[in-house]
């Protein structure tokens, strides 16, 4: 996994890496930090970021960090783009959400969504969707100086002469995904 992350850093000139701290992610985070790679550890089950609600009281809009970053991804997709990848599309549409009594959004657990979709005859890899959504766990402006809503991560003087395609080279960089 670390080798794949290093390839992607080189290919996309990534300045920061967000890694799921659950499961085997802790070891990946430790190794990347040993190599001097800036890493943000994301715990999907941790608390969501509070926002100012009515009467200037801070209140979480989401049940946990996972629901929050999936919600941020959903909002971005209204104006963003996805690679032509049916597996990713199915995975992003997989988990159901519901509103809890305290008016916070909760996503169906990864395990429950996978079980339900399998019973319905749909198989997909939820890790693919989590990989996209985890990119919304950090404020890209804060760490990269790049506004995530702009088309290119390049500075004006180093901007390429062709249109920026964030998915160019993706299949070559990650052949094991397809």
Where are these regions (language model features)?
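Acidic two-metal-ion nuclease catalytic site recognized across multiple nuclease folds
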Residues: 93-178
């Amino acid at each position: 996994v670390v080798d794949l992350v290093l390839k992607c850093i080189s290919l996309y000139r990534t300045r920061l890496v967000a890694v799921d701290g659950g499961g085997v992610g802790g070891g990946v985070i430790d190794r990347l930090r040993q190599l001097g790679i800036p890493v943000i550890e994301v715990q999907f089950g941790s608390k969501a970021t509070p926002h100012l609600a009515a009467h200037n009281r801070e209140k979480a809009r989401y049940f946990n960090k996972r629901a929050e970053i999936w919600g941020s991804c959903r909002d971005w997709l209204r104006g963003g783009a996805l690679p032509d990848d049916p597996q990713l599309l199915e995975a992003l549409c997989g988990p159901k959400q519901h509103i809890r009594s305290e008016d916070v959004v909760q996503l169906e657990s990864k395990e429950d969504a996978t079980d339900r979709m399998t019973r319905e005859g749909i198989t997909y890899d939820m890790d693919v969707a989590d990989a996209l959504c985890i990119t919304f766990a950090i404020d890209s402006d804060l760490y990269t100086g790049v506004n995530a809503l702009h088309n290119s991560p390049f500075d004006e003087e180093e901007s390429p002469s062709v249109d920026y395609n964030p998915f160019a080279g993706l299949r070559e960089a990650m052949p094991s995904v397809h």
